[in-house]
């Protein structure tokens, strides 16, 4: 079973339990859903000239933001995710120094410094614990903030930004460290409200000077990390109005735009986080409901600014649209916000970014409907957007290589990328020694390359295709598709071709070297391939046609001249995502091995191809501890830097795109034989949109074998010479020929033997070409399906009269696609979808058929909440029924929830986890008796929904839901299958409770030594039992919660029904206590709270 993840760069996350090495990010709120990106363009990442693009995952701006800020090597924040540096002095302060200061001096000092003056500010250690565990000290900072709030001026911010950062550091440390958990309480955070209001009621609270803008920004950050009330939120309207009224002047001012953005972001995060801690997750149950309309009016007004929209302010309008959609639920009449989004769709041009953003927000927050209840048909909007922004399609290699591009991406550029792929592939195959796909039938049988016109248009890919755009390009392995964009030198230090070469290498890695999909298997559990995948991708991007693989100047210049500032060999081999450095140093290591130790390169590559994880780890460990090898690696980098002026960036030559005269294919074959002495040469012709190409494969017999590594070097050199000799011939088409060799053997004479493959331009006009008849697509499937249920689509009855079907492309109408002949799909939302099947024949002919599919709702049979503690298998909550929805929450302290269910008979079991906050959550499933090896994990991931299914044998299974990135999040989990609610052995001789026993005067009488099976529900919240005690006794009461509902028990004396005499001690699902009782009548009240659904329990009474 393959895992639907993507191979990537900046943000690959390991699906491991929380206690594994935690991944951190160097950029602020970098990704959506748990998607991973690759080959992020270093210059593009910082090319916005201070502008902040829309943050896709706005739910992560609080503790996550702080975590990201301290993720860099020097423990200092990066980018716009932290307050601007004050830089008033360069002195570094330790917590030991700060802890020795009195409160007054401390606060005054904080006002004069930057967060950068305290490098350990966000680190938990003895000093920070001592500092923040002192409640009076924290209170002094809050009072200091309030005082500064009253006294700051237009020219002096009185240290407000740094005071805020100190408080944010405390909240961060309190969230992730239980020793400081008091800082994470609403009570303490609410103590900031007077300070916030002091800031707002200061007459200087507005946009204006740099100091004023900084104060507004700091307030937004504080709101997001601390607290707010309707008054604080509504007090922000003047800032939003001022920005709107002066948008011509303020739109291009970074500090003002950033200040407004942080206000919107902080308010959105805090108010939505309150919902997740509110009964029923309902905005109506919060203090903000129907009380922040003034703020909403100003926010909504920023959604439509008419002809004042320009490149400087568009990003802020995009954010206003996004936050309007998310916060409309706080209005008594949400349709007001809904209409604001509708107005945006009417005001902005069809398929402009703002139009699509507004439509997306209606789809996400209002069920895809306008205020009149009509469907906006967002799927059609996305389809039209793809048609507008990607109107061109180019096919190569009989349809196995497809490019979809913007209208400004030139045909010449497309052709160059195709030929660049051949140069990279040829050198890649030489090194890895494999040209057969590890698994046939994967989506990457057809590679699709999507190229937008520009970075701006590329941002739409997040909406219309659902993938992160905070990168220079992204390869999604489970759909065999690579997304990127054309760029100018001002926008990127890399050309499109350079980036394409890097990404194309990831495609080759996934198809020919690394077994399974990205993220699947043991290789990915600890991130041991991180350096290999990214370092060799940078390396192979330097592939040439005839001169092997060259070190690229654009990457070499990123190496440090001072060895003390470089990554060591150990550091490279154990690199994790979070910084850019290991790309450069992994590139240098790959170049070192290629030029000085191919045996080492081959050995680690073979471990990967053979899926030998332990062998690979052992080999990496031995390399890491080899100090002599590290010295050679460092020496090699010295040589690269000393020669940097002579380096360049390999790109394809103009010969590929120049015209080529016609030449008989037989002449080409004979010429290749002549210069190479290749035997048994066979050829295969493939058609592309602009030209025809050939692959010729034959056998080369070399000299006496000197061992595989030496044979490889000899063959590599000889093949380069063969290509150069061929290029000397008069026909210029030979300058398009690339070649590789694989399958080393030694013949009976002791000579080495390789299979050699040539690829080049075929201009033979006599090559058989006929008029192709279009194939016919045929769809076989059901016409309706339940939401989240699997539906099967069969395209195998599609036909082609004069050939065969070579490719299938399903478009399921919800943005998802498949390239399989027989596909399965699940819809996440109800509605009617138009499914399209496009088939391509062996001659490039295309035909499309469509069919309507109706998706209907499937409501869970019951909704319950998890019962803590359930962090261990022995304390697991039971999931008693199929299609029961369980609500749970994870955090730094509560990082794992365990559940169990019993499978009654062999059959398919489906598990669906909805990640409500888009944080780092996943799940694994274990069989009772082997809790160390999982039997199933989340194989489907669209960013918020983690799915998996498998045919399971009867028995008990344990489900582990856990967080892997130190973020708090709420989730729901649903299990469907043949489940049974197994009554435990201890309950088989129990009596059944008899209703109605909901009041003391209707209590069910039971013996003081008895077992009772009872049931609670939302309509039956309590059961009462009467017990007569004849003698002084120790009554042991154990109530076992069978179905994980929220329940408890209290014991009352008949003499006082207002005050209980004893209560339960909770231990997982067991509620127990031993009560010392005098003779008399007692009432045991077993009750449910929070309306957590229907559940069974067992009462066990033992009178000692």
Curated annotation (Swiss-Prot):
Q: What does this protein do?
A: Clostridial collagenases are among the most efficient degraders of eukaryotic collagen known; saprophytes use collagen as a carbon source while pathogens additionally digest collagen to aid in host colonization. Has both tripeptidylcarboxypeptidase on Gly-X-Y and endopeptidase activities; the endopeptidase cuts within the triple helix region of collagen while tripeptidylcarboxypeptidase successively digests the exposed ends, thus clostridial collagenases can digest large sections of collagen.
Which EC class is this protein assigned?
A: hydrolase
Q: Where do the annotations place Ca(2+) 6 binding?
A: 995, 997, 1020, 1022-1023
Q: Which residues bind Ca(2+) 2?
A: 772-773, 800, 802, 841
UniProt lists the gene as colA
For this UniProt record, give its keywords in alphabetical order, as a comma-separated list.
Calcium, Hydrolase, Metal-binding, Metalloprotease, Protease, Repeat, Secreted, Signal, Virulence, Zinc, Zymogen
Residue ranges of region S3a collagen-binding domain? 865-979
Positions contributing to Ca(2+) 1 binding: 477, 510, 514, 516
Q: Where do the catalytic residues lie?
A: 503
User: Where is Zn(2+) bound in this sequence?
Assistant: 502, 506, 534
InterPro entries named in the record: ColG_subdomain, Ig-like_fold, Peptidase_C_arc/bac, Peptidase_M9_N_dom, Peptidase_M9A/M9B, PKD/Chitinase_dom, PKD_dom, PKD_dom_sf
UniProt-recorded Gene Ontology molecular function terms: metalloendopeptidase activity; zinc ion binding
* Name used for this protein in its record: Collagenase ColA
- The segment annotated Helper subdomain runs over 654-767
Q: Which residues bind Ca(2+) 5?
A: 993, 995, 1016, 1020, 1023
Keyword Repeat included in the entry's annotation:
yes
